């Protein structure tokens, strides 16, 4: 291409991008933090459009420079790209999701080797789907339901037979593994999750039972997979229904605080359990409220995390995760406060990049999480009756928007 052609193509592309997408206007807000939030929102859209919208999932640092040996991490694709269908760019996520079909044989072999049906999506990988060796990554499971969630977001943006035909088979294969991975506890008459390292990676695979975020995600994704069966004209899987009905509720302590996992009885006494990701908050926020959770206990947990967490040992997406939890629990002051909390890993540089430390000078999951959180804070979720549920209703946050879609 000649320079003039490139300039013309770029001009037309960006005009189309901004005209198609949703928009959020903070100019009527009087809270002094609003301009900074608007800056982060606008720059994040641009940064993610150029670095997290390709034919393969993006690495944490996108195309800026290599991180983790240039590998991308499938548990991060939700953070990079879940915002896209919510902001009018389902086509960008759709483009990336096609990669899953190309690596299906690898994922099927991983599941087969471990004695499971269906497909087990890898954690740290590359365009070929090769599973990178790791004493942590191979035990993670929260990347598994992402495909179901992301396919659901694409469908909600374009509810059509075409989308069902395109993704239903892999939705079902993903759920087959999830059902088989859960263990039925005959003594207590319940299904449990074990043998995994949860999103909060300070826990150990050998001892962890029923991590809360993963339990909630299993519940949501299996319900969603059943919906896809019905949309495709298939009968519900009765075994899956039994698991959905009998999944273990989240474990809590005598103070009615949810534990990092059922076995982690010292969650609030041992800093190992109160560092890294506060994944328990993802159980409601990233995901809708469900029958495994009591909202009053989850509010207790949010308040404890807010006041006591080891915030110096967090990551960029922990702040939007906290904001989404606060939004769904009816605490908009905390939602805004989380997005703008003055912590090193919640720093957004002049260019919009989410700075973590000298090694990770940009961290795109933080940017993507920010946009997903703002969508939830504005457009809410299925059944939400509150306007702008994530912003205080005291008149200082007169947020106006168009084109955003609610979350599940």
Map each language-model feature to its residues.
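Acidic/histidine-rich catalytic neighborhood
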Residues: 173, 177-228
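Acidic/polar, glycine-enriched structural segments that form the non-catalytic walls/loops
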Residues: 2-71, 90, 100-108
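Aromatic- and acidic-residue-enriched carbohydrate-binding clefts of CAZyme catalytic domains
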Residues: 122-133, 201-207
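Active-site-adjacent bridging/hinge elements
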Residues: 15-21, 50-61, 116-128, 142-149, ...
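Glycine- and aromatic-rich loop/turn segments at beta-sheet edges
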Residues: 54-67, 108-115, 119-123, 180-198, ...
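Primarily short, surface-exposed interaction patches in extracytoplasmic proteins
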Residues: 25-34, 56-70, 80, 103-104, ...
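Active-site core of glycosidic bond-cleaving carbohydrate-active enzymes
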Residues: 70-109, 127-130, 136-161, 165-169, ...
């Amino acid at each position: 291409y000649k320079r003039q052609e490139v300039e013309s193509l770029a001009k037309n592309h960006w005009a189309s991008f901004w005209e198609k997408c949703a928009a959020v206007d903070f100019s009527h807000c009087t809270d002094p933090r609003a301009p900074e939030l608007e800056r982060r929102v606008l720059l994040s859209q641009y940064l993610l459009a150029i670095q997290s919208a390709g034919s393969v999932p993006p690495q944490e640092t996108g195309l800026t420079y290599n991180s983790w040996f240039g590998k991308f991490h499938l548990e991060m694709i939700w953070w990079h790209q879940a915002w896209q269908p919510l902001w009018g760019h389902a086509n960008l996520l759709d483009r990336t999701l096609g990669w899953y079909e190309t690596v299906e044989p690898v994922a099927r072999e991983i599941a087969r080797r471990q004695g499971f049906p269906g497909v087990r999506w890898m954690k740290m990988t590359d365009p070929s789907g090769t599973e990178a060796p790791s004493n942590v990554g191979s035990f993670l499971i929260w990347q598994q339901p992402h495909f179901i969630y992301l396919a659901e977001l694409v469908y909600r943006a374009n509810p059509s037979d075409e989308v069902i035909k395109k993704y239903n088979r892999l939705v079902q294969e993903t759920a087959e593994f999830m059902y088989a991975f859960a263990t039925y506890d005959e003594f207590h008459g319940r299904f449990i999750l074990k043998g995994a390292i949860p999103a909060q990676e300070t826990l150990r695979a050998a001892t962890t039972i029923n991590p809360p975020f993963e339990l909630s995600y299993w519940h949501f994704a299996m319900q969603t997979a059943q919906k896809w069966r019905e949309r495709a004209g298939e009968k519900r899987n009765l075994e899956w229904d039994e698991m959905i009905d009998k999944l273990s509720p989240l474990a809590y302590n005598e103070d009615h605080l949810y534990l990092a996992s059922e076995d982690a009885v010292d969650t609030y006494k041992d800093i190992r359990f109160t560092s890294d990701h506060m994944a328990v908050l993802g159980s409601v926020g990233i995901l809708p409220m469900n029958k495994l959770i009591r909202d009053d206990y989850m509010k207790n947990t949010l308040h404890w995390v807010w006041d006591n967490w080891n915030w110096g040992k967090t990551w960029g997406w922990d702040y939007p995760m906290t904001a989404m939890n606060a939004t769904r629990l009816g605490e908009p002051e905390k939602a805004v406060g989380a997005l703008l909390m003055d912590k090193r890993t919640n720093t957004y540089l002049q260019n919009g990049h989410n700075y973590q430390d000298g090694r990770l000078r940009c961290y795109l999951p933080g940017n993507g999480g920010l946009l997903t959180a703002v969508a939830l804070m504005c457009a809410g979720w299925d059944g939400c009756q509150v306007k702008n549920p994530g912003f205080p209703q005291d008149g200082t946050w007169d947020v106006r928007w168009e084109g955003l879609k609610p979350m599940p």
